[in-house]
Regions:
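Bacterial N-terminal signal peptides that target proteins for export
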Residues: 3-15
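Secreted glycan hydrolases and related glycan-binding modules that recognize and/or cleave
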Residues: 30-89, 93-117, 121-123, 127-534
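Hydrophobic alpha-helical transmembrane signal-anchor segments
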Residues: 14-22
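C-terminal motif of bacterial Sec signal peptides marking the signal peptidase cleavage site
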Residues: 24-28
């Protein structure tokens, strides 16, 4: 039994039979449920105690969204305060009584999701193996059946059969469940799809939903990718796991306000996985590690309602003497990871960003080529057209490749630097299936004219901007100013970033030149052909 004198060391909220953690801090994507006070104090308690947690770092009351008639999945595991001295058998159960206790204690009125639509894998039984602190993940299957627009809850409690004690204040975990309508689908399928990577350290992905096609009002972007979560070595376990910084964590924590609005418009939302300066990476995972990492990715997709993942094999520090669970870098290992992802996530998008050829999956696994396993791949050197590059990857057709990625931030003058409309035409004519954009800065640039230059070629249509934009942490839009033809007329004060002076002789021949720094001058823009030119 739990001795009362240790309660102050545990520092958990005591609420009936429910582990209440609505005040927990969501600080990262790793399994990172923060209990008030240091969790290290749990190890000072006599005996071994356990508690129920969600995978993917999800705080309690994280909403799982069901789209139309599609099922959803929660991912739970059991964690001990100390390594188990023997195998600990854990039994999870769907617990309506625990939800009622939570409602009474917290003055809430959550309705239990229809129990006949819920089930636990393997009858709810799972094991914490001797010498370990955590069980594997247990899937909570949530079939469609609730009323759209209603917020439900599902409480899952746990008991153990020897080896550990589950105290009454940490035996239950609660997910919210939100049935939503089916995604809208674009009426006419596109031969060339658009993908936009958004640097969420600075920008809000909601901005991507403010650009629409003039003819039918559908979104300009097909896929938006959250850039980026990381693959890192877990210092406690030595395995590869997902790590998210505060900005990515904020976005996932607020998926209902940031991800769902884009999906409601028909835009798919992916999360990019990026290497992060240690030996873990897409190209170094062993077969078992790839299986394990794919399962973790699935937990993120299921819990946060992601449509898929993009993989960017930059910044990993691959080792020539890899640790257990890792191998020397190879495209074959990368292909194995994509195979494991495809096996357990057949309906999710899997995309690849590459710029070195060897930083991408290649070859085949179990008879499936890299080109068959991925949904698309793109060339990552910006403003350069890599026609024919797809031939380097096994089984990859042009329809799955994006050879012309455009960086559209300040570095490239909003995308105009290095942009060539004729290249877009050639991309389309050659049969390529993807046009990629990277790092939009919509609070700095008005992109409707730029995107129109692309869409006129690809879709014979123009792109309109709603005039609204979002700051990084905004859930509601700010009204901006839409520039029209007349907006540019008049006199403008301009400042150059630099200036070049060329000195000529009396015969008008250039003799020498010199940089002369920033200069200020006035420019007057006048109407030429009304509404069309200046």
């Amino acid at each position: 039994m739990l001795i009362m004198k240790y309660l102050n060391n545990i520092k958990l909220s005591l609420v009936a039979a429910v582990f209440v953690c609505t005040g927990t801090v969501f600080t990262g994507c790793e399994d990172d449920l923060t209990i008030s006070g240091s969790t290290d104090k749990l190890e000072t308690v006599d005996g071994v105690y356990g508690y129920v947690r969600s995978a993917a770092g999800a705080r309690e009351l994280t909403p799982i969204t069901l789209f139309g008639d599609k099922a959803g999945t929660g991912h739970l595991f059991f964690e001990l305060t100390k390594a188990a001295e023997q195998d600990v058998t854990v039994t999870f159960k769907i617990d309506k009584d625990a939800l009622e206790a939570y409602n009474e204690a917290n003055n809430t009125s959550y309705e239990m999701y229809p129990v006949d639509k819920l089930s636990l894998a393997n009858g709810g039984k799972i094991t914490v193996k001797a010498g370990e602190k955590k069980s594997a993940s247990m899937e909570l299957n949530i079939n469609a059946g609730g009323t759209i627009g209603t917020t439900y809850a599902v409480a899952v409690s746990a008991t153990t059969d020897g080896g550990a004690t589950v105290s009454t204040n940490n035996q239950t975990y609660i997910y919210l469940v939100k049935p939503q309508p089916t995604y809208p689908v674009r009426g006419t399928a596109r031969d060339v799809k658009t993908l936009c990577f958004v640097e969420v350290n600075n920008e809000n992905i909601l901005n991507c939903g403010e650009y629409t096609m003039a003819k039918d009002g559908t979104p300009f972007f097909d896929v938006v990718s959250i850039f980026a979560a990381n693959i890192n070595v877990d210092s406690k376990t030595g395995r590869a796991h997902i790590f998210c910084n505060d900005q990515v964590s904020f976005l996932l924590k607020n998926a209902d306000q940031i991800i769902r609005p884009l999906q409601a418009k028909g835009i798919k939302v992916n999360m990019t996985i990026l290497g992060n300066h240690d030996e873990s990476g897409m190209s170094s995972l062993s077969k078992e590690a790839a299986e394990d990492f794919a399962k973790e990715l699935k937990a993120y997709a299921d819990i946060y309602g992601l449509d898929g993942f993009d993989f960017d094999d930059e910044y990993s520090n691959y080792s020539e003497n890899p640790s257990p669970g890792f191998e020397e870098r190879s495209s074959a290992n990368y292909c194995r990871l994509i195979y494991e992802c495809r096996k357990i996530m057949p309906d999710k998008l899997l995309g690849i960003y590459e710029y070195l050829l060897y930083d991408a999956p290649n070859g085949s696994v179990e008879g499936k080529s890299a080109g068959e396993l991925v949904d698309y791949m793109c060339y990552g050197t910006y403003q350069r057209y890599a026609k024919g590059r797809e031939e380097n990857f096994a089984g990859l057709p042009k329809s799955k490749y994006g050879p012309y990625s455009l960086k559209i931030n300040n570095e490239y003058n909003g995308g105009w630097s290095g942009f060539n409309q004729e290249t877009i035409q050639d991309l389309k004519d050659a049969g390529y299936g993807l046009q990629v954009f990277y790092n939009p800065e919509p609070r700095t640039f008005s992109y409707d004219h730029y995107f129109t230059a692309v869409s006129k070629v690809l879709y014979n249509d123009e792109v309109e901007w709603t005039g609204k934009y979002y700051n990084r942490t905004d859930f509601t839009s700010i009204q901006g100013t839409k520039l029209a033809y007349e907006s540019y007329l008049g006199e403008w004060a301009a400042t150059s970033s630099n200036s070049l002076y060329i000195y000529i002789d009396e015969d008008n021949n250039p003799r020498w030149w010199d940089w002369s720094g920033s200069q200020k001058f006035n420019v007057r823009i006048e109407e030429k052909e009304a509404g069309k030119s200046y």
